[in-house]
Amino acid sequence: QSVHKTLPSLTQTALLHIKCNRPGGGCYADRERIDRYLHMVQSSSPSYLLMASIENSIFQMEHMDMMSYGRQLHKLRSRLGQMRHLRLADTGIIGQAGIKDLDISKIVVSTRGTYLVSQENGDTGFTGARLDDILRREYHLEMEMCGADYVTAITTAMDSAQGLERLGDALTRIDSCLASRGSDARRKNGKGPVTGTDDKSGGEDMHRGSVYSMRCDTAMSMGEAMDRNMKSVGLEDSAGCISGEFVYIYPPGIPIVAPGEWISGPTLEVILEYRDKGLPVQGPADKSLRTIRIVQKD
C-alpha cells in the first residue's frame, strides 16, 4: 500500500500488509518466503526520514476528526449523485466485473453517453480526457487519472470542506453544460448516482469495454521477446503481431500489452481509441504512437 497516496507521508513510502487471521491462527502468506525475496531487493541502508514520515502520518490520522471527513464526503457524493448527465460511480457497481467494494473517498465520474452542446461545432462527444482538461484549466483541479470516459479524483483526510465543495461546484457546473444521448430516464429526471440496479446502462456501463478486462495471450516470455530482433510497424497494422514493447496508460501504469504478448484485434481497437481521445498512452519508443516495435518472425 502506497502510504504517500492518501496519507500525509513522504513520496516513496509504502507498506506491505500480511494477513494473519486464518482460522486456527497463522498467516495466509508464507512469511519466510516473503522475507527471503525482500532481502533480495531491499536496501541495507533504510531511510529513517521515510520511516519516520510513515509513523508521523499514522500519528496524525489517529488524532484527526475522521467523522467530519466522512460527513463531508457523504455530502459531496450526495450532491454529485444528483447530476443529470455526468454519473458518479456508487455502491451499485459492487459485484460487477470483479468489484468487491467501493472506496467512497475515490470520486469516479463517468462521461459516457454525454456531449457538450457547442453553438460553433454542434454536438461534441465529451470524453474523460476532455473533462480532465476542463477541470485542470478552468477550475485548477488536478484529477488523479482519466480514462476514455471517466475521471478519478482522490480525496484525503487532509482535504478541507472548502476544497471538496470546490470539486462539487466544478462538476455540477460542467454537468449543467452537457446533454445526454438516448432516453435514459435517470439522466432526464436527475435521479441519483449510478447504482446498477434500476438502470441496465448504469453500473455495468461504468466498466463495459475496459481494456483491463481483456487478456492478451503470451507467445513467449518477456525476456525472450526483449532479446529478439525487432522491427517497427504501423500501430494500426500491428494486430496479430507479438509486441516488443509495453503499452500502458499512466496513470495507473498497468500494462495493456507487454513484450512477448500477442496484440489482439480488440485490444488494438481500444488502444487506438485511447490514443485518438488524447489519453496518456505510453510505452512505445515512438512517442507519436504511430508505430510500435514488434518481434520479428524467424
Predicted regions and their residues:
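Short secondary-structure boundary/capping segments
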Residues: 14-17, 58, 170
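Conserved C-terminal alpha-helix-loop-beta "cap" of PLP-dependent enzymes
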Residues: 78-192, 196-283
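Terminal helix/beta-alpha structural elements that buttress the NAD(P)+-binding lobe
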Residues: 284-297
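Conserved PLP-dependent catalytic core of the aminotransferase class-I/II
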Residues: 31-32, 58-96
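Short, contiguous, pocket-lining structural segments
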Residues: 6-8, 42-50, 65-68, 72, ...
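Amphipathic alpha-helix from the class-I
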Residues: 52-65, 158-162
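Active-site PLP attachment segment
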Residues: 1-35, 42-53
